[in-house]
């Protein structure tokens, strides 16, 4: 399905990502963890082709994504949608119009200029908002929503592209614990119900363990861990974060206090929806 083959990104003398290799042979939810500057965001931006790799290849269904240009590159970016920490919404525009922006890559310039959308796209946008629990806010300006609601609007916009892969770059870093939980549950359900691959950069170990099928650890641009959530021990975490024996997971905790925190959310996301 998706293969990242020795992907490297250099900025001058600095190597941001160093020969990263990943194989994703079926839809799953992957969490990428590591310290700030480990190369997590750069890796996602290269996969989406927002940034070009210096070396290496990205293969999707045996097609070399790194060679795509023009319309083919834009089509890939729709197939591999990206969600950002800062939401990237148009604040003074209503929620449903922000969601409809997910269709811009397949609309004419004239239709874009005059905000002309097919009725079926409008209905689909509202259905997606309803699925994410925010259809009641469709007519509101995006700036009137909470951070968690805005991030769900960003997820809805990504879903309008009908992507095979969703890349989420620190999707909960700016959210309070309760909204962070809501957003992660939404991403988990999208994977489980739609069969989409979700790859999320995460800043907390407990979030990666709770919601992901697979965890990738990056340190200094290299992938130093790739395994199951239960294999992410404190010792492994120390290696990923470059910490000594005093390392405490509490420093990376989202502090979401739930009764079933000990259970992987990949087993219970549906029950908490």
Curated annotation (Swiss-Prot):
It is an enzyme of class 7 (translocase). GO terms for molecular function: ABC-type phosphonate transporter activity; ATP binding; ATP hydrolysis activity. It holds the Pfam family ABC_tran. ATP binds at residues 34-41. GO terms for cellular component: plasma membrane. It is a peripheral membrane protein. SMART domains: AAA. Residues 2-245 form the ABC transporter domain. Keywords: ATP-binding, Cell inner membrane, Cell membrane, Membrane, Nucleotide-binding, Phosphonate transport, Translocase, Transport. The keyword Cytoplasm does not apply. Its main location: membrane. InterPro entries: AAA+_ATPase (IPR003593), ABC_transporter-like_ATP-bd (IPR003439), ABC_transporter-like_CS (IPR017871), ABC_transpr_PhnC (IPR012693), MetN_ABC_transporter-like (IPR050086), P-loop_NTPase (IPR027417). Its EC number is 7.3.2.2. It is found in: Cell inner membrane. It comes from the Bacteria. It catalyses: phosphonate(out) + ATP + H2O = phosphonate(in) + ADP + phosphate + H(+). Gene3D superfamilies: P-loop containing nucleotide triphosphate hydrolases. Part of the ABC transporter complex PhnCDE involved in phosphonates import. Responsible for energy coupling to the transport system. Belongs to the ABC transporter superfamily. Phosphonates importer (TC 3.A.1.9.1) family. The complex is composed of two ATP-binding proteins (PhnC), two transmembrane proteins (PhnE) and a solute-binding protein (PhnD). This is Phosphonates import ATP-binding protein PhnC.
